[in-house]
Amino acid sequence: MEFISQFLEMLLAERALSKNSILSYKRDLLDFHNYLAKQKLSELNITTDNIRNWVEYLAENSLQARSINRKISTIKSYYEFLISENHTNLNPLLNIDLPKYQNKLPEILSIDDIKSLLEYCSQDISPEGARLNAMIHLLYASGLRVSELVSLKLSDILSNKVSREVKKIFSVLGKGNKERIIVINEPAINSLVKYLVVRDNFVNKTKPKNLIYLFPSSAAAGYMTRQNFAILLKSAALYAGLNPEHISPHVLRHSFASHLLEGGADLRVIQELLGHADISTTQIYTHLQTNHLKKALLHHPLSKN
């Protein structure tokens, strides 16, 4: 466990990873540590065969190939660290093949579905309704990651604290502490203005930590949790007549990108707005558009034979 703590400290100090990324590394490492303990194995004396058995164990427990790949990558990095610190001289994962998986196309909502969702939310005039309406408008207008959305600070979006004027353009720190520019539209601004009127309903003045956040709560972090927002979003989808199983904060982010591309936005611009380090990550949305075109062609008279 001591080596795991040292590795996590190194990640935090040298790679500038986000808190969520560090937690993901920690979970993978602790799961691996627990597996070794059950098998009565030492992390400094395991073999490639031991690792293959571990990978088989993960697959047998219905873990998806993508998740297994992430765990392998985490443990491989961990052993590279152990080697660099002279704790061992062998990386047992060097000859481990990554399981293959199909790169599933992201799920998106249609523009009509988005309109139905926003229409339902705009009808709820309670403070909770105003908050959810603002969060959904902001997420769909900006393509923010849900972790970025919930942790926004009041100062991030206000150009004037006294008049509470909302900025149209602001910046966020994304993955790897990389700053990027966010631009939002008038409907999102209007929803935020309405929400700010009732925001104090959610402020717990006995916990000063939550005062600085746009969406404050009594949660330990001081702002609404990702999980709570996802639950509220699915509930709103149900009342809006949508299937809650097909909606999540990430689906709204995907919908933002796909609808921009459909409207003629440049792929490089979408990459910047989403905060993707690699254009290949953004290119998946072009495959979505290709699928839509193929479906549209099915309505051609010569396609019906």
From Swiss-Prot:
Q: GO molecular function: any one? A: tyrosine-based site-specific recombinase activity
In terms of superkingdom, the source organism counts as Bacteria
Q: Where in the cell is it found?
A: Cytoplasm
UniProt KW keywords:
Cell cycle, Cell division, Chromosome partition, Cytoplasm, DNA integration, DNA recombination, DNA-binding
Stretches assigned to the Tyr recombinase domain: 104-298
The record's section on Gene3D superfamilies has:
1.10.150.130, Intergrase catalytic core
Any one Gene Ontology cellular component term annotated for this protein: cytoplasm
Q: Does the keyword DNA-binding apply?
A: yes
Q: Which Pfam families does this UniProt record tie to the protein?
A: Phage_int_SAM_1, Phage_integrase
State the Gene Ontology BP annotations.
cell division; chromosome segregation; DNA transposition
Q: Which PROSITE patterns match?
A: CB (PS51900), TYR_RECOMBINASE (PS51898)
- The question of whether DNA-binding is a record keyword is answered with yes
UniProt-annotated catalytic positions: 145, 175, 250, 253, 276, 285
Q: Which residues form the Core-binding (CB) domain?
A: 1-83
Name the coiled-coil region(s). Answer: none
Cite the record's note on assembly.
Forms a cyclic heterotetrameric complex composed of two molecules of XerC and two molecules of XerD.
Give a short account of what the protein does: Site-specific tyrosine recombinase, which acts by catalyzing the cutting and rejoining of the recombining DNA molecules. The XerC-XerD complex is essential to convert dimers of the bacterial chromosome into monomers to permit their segregation at cell division. It also contributes to the segregational stability of plasmids.
Q: Which family does it belong to?
A: Belongs to the 'phage' integrase family. XerD subfamily.
Q: Which PANTHER family match?
A: PHAGE INTEGRASE-RELATED, TYROSINE RECOMBINASE XERC
What is the official name of this protein in its record?
A: Tyrosine recombinase XerD
Taxonomic lineage: Bacteria, Pseudomonadati, Pseudomonadota, Alphaproteobacteria, Rickettsiales
State the encoding gene. xerD
